[in-house]
Amino acid sequence: MRIEARIFELLTVFFIIVGVVYGFFTAQSRTGVEWAGTTAIVLTAGLSLIIGTYFRFVARRLDLRPEDYEDAEIVDGAGDLGFFSPGSFWPILLAGAGSVAALGLAFFEPWLIAVGVICVIAAAAGLVFEYHLGPEKH
């Protein structure tokens, strides 16, 4: 987690520098500082700082991972990484439901937003509980 914390802390510094440069150069224009972009960049710096700080605190509590060693090999991280369901159709349904909800937001159609959100909730529940059904359901 130390590497991830360092990445996000460097991103914070980058976004602060970009925010200052962006604010300076937009202030030189005839319309003055463009506040929407400047605010967005500064808030992005704040969000990356939050994530970097979280990763830094988590890294203190966890043991070193193979990725944290300077002389680590690929083989050091080998092993079981978890369960993957290769035949699941729920991610496709979740993506389709998210697309419907996004279209509803884009065109501001409340009925389409409602249908999309309901479908997202149903597809997310199906994805989470896919293997939590009883044995008679399979």
Swiss-Prot record:
Protein keywords: Cell membrane, Membrane, Translocase, Transmembrane, Transmembrane helix
Transmembrane region(s): 7-27, 35-55, 81-101, 102-122
Reactions this protein catalyses: 4 Fe(II)-[cytochrome c] + O2 + 8 H(+)(in) = 4 Fe(III)-[cytochrome c] + 2 H2O + 4 H(+)(out)
Pfam families for the chain: Cyt_c_ox_IV
InterPro entries recorded: Cyt_c_oxidase_su4_actinobac (IPR021050)
Similarity comment: family membership: Belongs to the cytochrome c oxidase bacterial subunit CtaF family.
Organism, scientific name: Nocardia farcinica (strain IFM 10152)
Stated role: Part of cytochrome c oxidase, its function is unknown.
Gene Ontology CC, one term: plasma membrane
EC primary class: translocase
Disulfide bonds: none
Keyword Transmembrane in annotation: yes
Record flagged with keyword tRNA-binding: no
Coiled-coil region list: none
Enzyme Commission code(s) on record: 7.1.1.9
Membrane topology: Multi-pass membrane protein
GO biological process: electron transport chain
Subunit structure: Associates with subunits I, II and III to form cytochrome c oxidase.
Single GO molecular function: cytochrome-c oxidase activity
Annotated compartments: Cell membrane
Principal location class: membrane
Protein name: Probable cytochrome c oxidase polypeptide 4
